[in-house]
Every structure is written in structure tokens, then in C-alpha cells.
Swiss-Prot record:
Belongs to the aerobic coproporphyrinogen-III oxidase family. GO terms for biological process: protoporphyrinogen IX biosynthetic process. The lineage of its organism: Bacteria, Pseudomonadati, Pseudomonadota, Gammaproteobacteria, Lysobacterales. It is found in: Cytoplasm. The gene is hemF. Homodimer. This is Oxygen-dependent coproporphyrinogen-III oxidase. Substrate binds at residues 92, 108-110, 257-259. Keywords: Cytoplasm, Heme biosynthesis, Metal-binding, Oxidoreductase, Porphyrin biosynthesis. GO terms for cellular component: cytoplasm. It comes from Stenotrophomonas maltophilia (strain K279a). Its EC number is 1.3.3.3.
Length: 298
């Protein structure tokens, strides 16, 4: 297999493994698969689990798509590639749990190639994972970042710090002056050594369940009421704001004529906004603000 096909094979297997693990922990709902084709080139398989015992909605999509001209969002940082043809493959997921004590999470791993006259002129990896709690626990955040740091360790002493910082900077809502959650890892435009970079992509993809599932198991049976549920729905609004205003993957998908149902799969099934909402001083809800700033968790 060539490089692209090797990455593609890994990603389809990763989607299968994550789906099996999430179905097992949910115990009730199953993923429904939607196979789709893209007119300009390629396609994918979108899987969505809804109304489960643990997950209100869990979406995970695999795609392998191509086009004749790079959209602006993809060539903004690489102007020399403007107008090149391209092919991209990736797995992207967002899980929205029902219980407000279980954090929402997002992960993405992807590979991109640009071509001219049938020759690959550039290729790079990107991805990461991040956590968005509504009622955070220090031990959960520390576990999340410990897994991230451990998987980064074989790739150099600076890898975790650099990609954690990138995550904090990327998942930041400037109009709210807060991070989307407690961070994790984020990287893009990783290139130079295919085997080493592909190994890192696999470490991130494989490490996601190690980071997330123990938190789900610890919090999924926590007792909650209407107050916690209403706060969860309110905070989900921040997720919508980020994805529609800032997220490069969403912008790339829409600009490149992607499948809107799959692109917007990340949005929560239920959400609310409330004008001028301010949590009660000293409350658990007010405490969340202390976590929405970059900090060293380990």
C-alpha cells in the first residue's frame, strides 16, 4: 500500500474500534451508519448513536475526499499550494453525553495530500483530542492530560507541551474570552518524516479511548437534576459558537462543498442560550470558569 492507503486503512479500523467501545459502555443504543459519496470525489461513512443510556448523541465520521482546487481555508497558511488538487482522509468524532457530569469530548486525526500534475507536492498530518466538562473534577482533567503526556513522550520532551499549548490556543472563544474546555492535544501541518509522523497519529488515535473511557465510567451514574441539565444545555451553546465561528475543519468542509449533515454532526442535539446568564456566586456552575483558562494540569 502507498502512504495514503496505509493511513486510510488505519483510520477505518480506528472508527470501528471506537464505535465498538462506545456501544459497549453505553449498553443500549447502537451506531447507525450512513454511507455517502461526494460528487467531486470520494465519500465516507458517518455513524451516529442517539438516545443512549450514556450518550445523548455520539457521532463519528470517516471520510476520504478529493477535489481539483484547494479551498481557501486549506491554503491560507500555504499560499504556494493555492489551486492545487487535493485528497484528504480522516476520522472526526464528537460525543455529547446525557449526564452533565460526563464531559463532552472531541477527537480528530487526519492526513492531507496536495498534488500538481498527478504528483504529490505536499502532505501533512493533523489531529488531537480535547475535553469539555460542565462539572469538572481535578482528577479527571489530570488523568486526561497524563494520558496525553504519556503518548507524546516517545516523540520528544517538547511534544506534549507544544501540542497542549496549541490546543489551548486553538480551542479558544475570543468573543467569550475563555477556552472551550480543559484542552488536550492539537497539531496540524505535521510533516517531514512520514513514518514518525504516522506513528504519532496512531498514538493519538489509539490513546483517545484510554483518556476518555475511564472518565465516562467514573461519572456516568452520577445523580443530577434539572439544574445540572439546564446548565449543560446552556454550556453546549459555547460548543455551537466555536464550531460555527472558529473551527477550521467545519469551514474547510463547507467551503469545499462537503456533506453538511456529516460536517455538522458535531453539533449537540439539544442546546439553549440565555441572555445575560450569570451563575450563582460560589456555586458548582460558577466554579467552571476557573477551568476555562490555560493551565498546567500535571
Amino acid at each position: 500500500m502507498n502512504e495514503f492507503e496505509r493511513v486510510r486503512a488505519y483510520l477505518t479500523d480506528l472508527q470501528d474500534r471506537i464505535c465498538a467501545a462506545i456501544e459497549a459502555v453505553d449498553g443500549r443504543a447502537r451506531f447507525q451508519e450512513d454511507l455517502w459519496q461526494r460528487a467531486e470525489g470520494g465519500g465516507g461513512r458517518t455513524r451516529v448513536l442517539r438516545d443512549g443510556a450514556v450518550f445523548e448523541q455520539a457521532g463519528i465520521g470517516f471520510s476520504d475526499v478529493s477535489g481539483s482546487r484547494l479551498p481557501p481555508s486549506a491554503s491560507a497558511n500555504r499560499p504556494e499550494l493555492a489551486g492545487a488538487s487535493w485528497r484528504a482522509t480522516g476520522v472526526s468524532l464528537v460525543f455529547h453525553p446525557l449526564n452533565p457530569y460526563v464531559p463532552t469530548t472531541h477527537a480528530n486525526v487526519r492526513f492531507f495530500q496536495a498534488q500538481r500534475d498527478g504528483e504529490v507536492v505536499a502532505s501533512w498530518f493533523g489531529g488531537g483530542f480535547d475535553l469539555t466538562p460542565f462539572y469538572p473534577f481535578d482528577e479527571d482533567v489530570q488523568h486526561w492530560h497524563q494520558v496525553a503526556r504519556d503518548l507524546c513522550a516517545p516523540f520528544g520532551d517538547e511534544r506534549y507541551a507544544a501540542h497542549k499549548r496549541w490546543c489551548d490556543e486553538y480551542f479558544f472563544l475570543r468573543h467569550r474570552n475563555e477556552t472551550r474546555g480543559v484542552g488536550g492535544l492539537f497539531f496540524d501541518d505535521l510533516h517531514g518524516d512520514f513514518e514518525r509522523d504516522f506513528a504519532y497519529l496512531r498514538a493519538v488515535g489509539d490513546g483517545f479511548l484510554d483518556a476518555y473511557l475511564p472518565i465516562v465510567q467514573q461519572r456516568k451514574d452520577a445523580i443530577y437534576g434539572e439544574r445540572e441539565r439546564e446548565f449543560q444545555l446552556y454550556r453546549r451553546g459555547r460548543y455551537v459558537e466555536f464550531n460555527l465561528v472558529y473551527d477550521r475543519g467545519t469551514l474547510f468542509g463547507l467551503q469545499s462543498g462537503g456533506r453538511s449533515e456529516s460536517i455538522l454532526m458535531s453539533l449537540p442535539p439539544r442546546v439553549r442560550w440565555e441572555y445575560g446568564f450569570t451563575p450563582e456566586a460560589g456555586s458548582a456552575e460558577a466554579r467552571l470558569a476557573d477551568y476555562l483558562v490555560p493551565r498546567d494540569w500535571l
